[in-house]
């Protein structure tokens, strides 16, 4: 089982570069194997207890103490359970009930599995697993440059054509996974290697087609530095900025003039221009159902009339293709203001948990990775996409079970 975990830790970032959607499958397998590992360890411990009757009572006492200890964190998950409950309730008045319930079930099972694994015992043989992760990331970087310089040599083995945007998901996965490797190197005193890896990944993202990943990783680096130099007030600063910006975003999206902005600043970037039109359209739709929203996973079923279609430089664009390409707008559109408030409460909660970490480097990297993931979600991807949720859980599990046990006393 240890070999399987090591192989998957290497495979997820490397295979993910060529096929980003593969993370939905590979991370799920990784979580299932890790979950079974925890069950096996528990069964072995239980078997050892029953072999010696003298150990039964102490083991029961320990179990009761553990339940009492874990009950406090369980109570602290009240806001999480409220958000989950509201997501389920929103399915009941969604545009497409069956699809919404199916999406909710998939996301809930994946998040529950990720939560269970991330709160299990740390990995054994962590040095070997850390090496596997770093080699996996380096392999992903190598594969990107092979595809970039050869016009998709490997991709064209399986597909008829290649375009650089096909690596966007892999770049997004790399941008958040690289932070795990960075903290591993930094905690081992390899500052030069840390800087080299950051610059290499930043350069890779700058020549890729994934602007969201480049911005997320670049701003993540700035966040890392600010965390180290603004220790006393950084949590308040980042929390206020994120929450205020998120609350104002739907208002700003409503007020913008996408046609004028696109012609002035985005004439050569049609993809970015299209997003402005999408955000403006979504903001107007939010006004129609501001409190409850349209229901979870309803974005792609919202109809647009002929008069709402976008005519941009002779091209016809749909004002809402599948999803809003912005997590805040999608949450507000589908779950309403109620869902947005609950979501931002979760954001505050996780930022507060990061601020409570004692290790300075681990805290700074955690902030950077969180902001990286958040920014990508503000520009790209459906918030309910399984591969993207899996990517976030993957990094969380690595940080908690692979990195944290060696450098942080859990406070």
From Swiss-Prot:
Q: Which InterPro entries match?
A: O-antigen_ligase-rel_domated, WaaL-like
Topology versus the membrane, per the UniProt entry? Multi-pass membrane protein
Listed under GO cellular component are:
membrane
Tell me where on the tree of life, at the top rank, the source sits: Bacteria
UniProt main location, coarse: membrane
Q: What are the TM regions of this chain, as residue ranges?
A: 15-35, 78-98, 101-121, 133-153, 166-186, 207-227, 233-253, 328-348, 361-381, 383-403
UniProt lists the family membership as follows: Belongs to the O-antigen ligase family.
- Its name, as the record gives it, is Putative polysaccharide ligase RC0486
What species was this sequence derived from?
Answer: Rickettsia conorii (strain ATCC VR-613 / Malish 7)
Q: Which lineage ranks, top first, belong to the organism behind this chain?
A: Bacteria, Pseudomonadati, Pseudomonadota, Alphaproteobacteria, Rickettsiales
